[in-house]
């Protein structure tokens, strides 16, 4: 039976679609992680030295091995809207593989040292911990 070009094109297209479909459905779901987001309000927000000391202390936390990602920042100068709270002075966002690693971080000597050396700088701290979905 002779093979024509249309049959070949159809077969290739169907095979390619099947491969894409199979590959997409076989992709593993991303693993859930713990995100630890902390907001700090300084006792003296006008003090550059206090802010710099807090940021330096937060940077030192990067040495804790269970931290997968560490971001440190200050309020962005984005559009002012009712839903945006930019009243904090410094924030840090960390990612952990699981709750056990977050506990290791909490108990780690570097974290304990950070709290001891920088705790006098802030008047308020709010923590949001979440499990990614």
PLM feature spans:
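Short, well-ordered beta-strand segments in beta-rich or mixed alpha/beta enzyme
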Residues: 33-42, 73, 78-106
